[in-house]
Amino acid sequence: MTSDEKAHKQASAADAEDIDEFGYKPSLVRSLGSFHTFAAGISYISILTGTFQLFYFGLGSAGPAYWWSWPLVFVGQLMVALCFCELAARYPVAGSIYNWSKRLSNHGVSWLAGWTMLTASIVSLAAVALALQATLPEIWSGFQFIPEDVSNAEALNGVILAALLIVFTTLINAFGTKLMAQINSTGVFLELIAAVVLIILLAINIVRGPQIVFDTGGIDASGRPLGYAGAFLVAMFASLYVMYGFDTASSLAEESHDPRRNAPKAILRALFFSFVLGGLILLFAIMSAPDLSDPALSSLGGLQTLILQVLGGGVGTVILIAVVIAVVVCDLAVHAAAIRLAFAMSRDNNLPAGSKLCTISPRFGTPVVSSVTIGIIAIVLLFVTFSPQIYTVVTSIAIIMIYTAYLLVTIPMLVQRVRGTWQPRPDGFSLGRWGLPVNILAILWGGFMTVNLAWPRNEVYNASEPFHWYLQWGGVLLPGVILGAGFAYYWTVQRHKTGVVAEHARVETPADVPTDKPVQEA
């Protein structure tokens, strides 16, 4: 046996031990390399999807100075990501958030973390798919299937495009991890190239200096309790909505080779590349815009309009095609992460019909039932949130719940650090003595941003007629209902059924049985 073969065998044995620690047996096929895990993380964040979808909101809320929210959010999310890197190295298993919380706290907290993340991921799947409407009709008017003279034509057309995309992601995720990873990796490669090309093209066409990022754009913040700071906190939504989901790189741990080392690297690389490329796109877009006071730039599809203004129809259209590719692979990654989380929870029989949801297809090696179920729920959500007002509320609470899920990991982790019971993997990623301050900053950041996201602002939750008080308080009410109702169901019904489903339970060998007890014969 060569040294490489021996190392591979040792790594495979270690991979199996990581799953064995949770009482599971290996069920998923390990076929993903380091680039695949990196691609999963960066495609979930998706630089082009997020910046093109929300540039208009940031610019319209706080002017060009909103750009500073990008590095600010990066620093805050980096604190969270560093904590996750330790966890990814220590517990490389599917459904990262859920299983990490289970090891850090108790079954109730872990279920709540998983439920929060799962519901938010399904909503995000629908929300990301709707981003096609802002780009496809700009490329070719034929993508506007609904005549413009029809009431709510854009919203209805967006639902149709989004539903078609979700059908696609459902089929790809159901037909095999390798196929999903190949499409995702190819899409990410193209997205990264397009992002670099876009940065260069915008830099060539700048018409003002970088000092523009200190300009508030004449935003009238006189009526706000915090003045311009209040406007900036609202504009931060445009960055907060983008830089999350980096934990997806660790959600594929049971399908990855050597996840202990690959997952932490993938998490940090995904966040870093997104920060650098996204930050430069936003900066040069602001510097190259012909007229920053153009109302079209502060309307839905603002960055798409800017690109066509600056680069012209031909080159601009090519960039917009790259944006569409980014949206597709982003939705593919969001769907994949939701499937792994549903699989992890149902494997513990912690979801209704858990034994069905965690079934692995012998043909494709994937949880097909979970893939299809999540796709159907997301498509139903598209029609439920048909109203732009309701859509804004629902997508906003998805981000609130993701930040809440992160807190349900970082807070128990801090408790273990303070108690001295947290032990990172000796040969894996470790923050060392920086672990405590980084963990504290991650919690402070997550808590403050959760409050900021949920604050009942008219301009976010109740921006257009008809005005309703319950929409304005939607960021508080809906997460409360989802968390409260979900946990009530778990506490009264599901927790009494909790236990690893037989299909995925570790099979004990005589060596696993304590020596003070007789070995039971079959």
Where are these regions (language model features)?
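TM-loop-TM module centered on a large, flexible mid-protein loop between adjacent transmembrane helices
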Residues: N99-S101, N106, P137-E148, G218-G223, ...
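Helix-loop-helix connectors at the membrane interface of multi-pass transporters/channels
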Residues: D4, Y98-K102, A129-I160, A194, ...
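A generic transmembrane alpha-helix motif of multi-pass inner-membrane proteins
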Residues: T392-A405, R433-A522
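Membrane-interface loop-to-helix entry segments
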Residues: N157-F214, Y244, I267-L271, T395-L408, ...
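Extracellular loop-to-transmembrane helix junctions
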Residues: I47-N152, F273-V276, L280, G474-I482
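Helix-loop-helix junctions that connect adjacent transmembrane segments
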Residues: G23-S27, W67, F143-N157, T186-T317
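C-terminal membrane-solvent junction of multi-pass transporters and transport-like membrane proteins
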Residues: P26, N157, T169, T186, ...
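Membrane-interface "cap" regions at the ends of multi-pass membrane proteins
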Residues: M1-A65, L78-L82, V493-A522
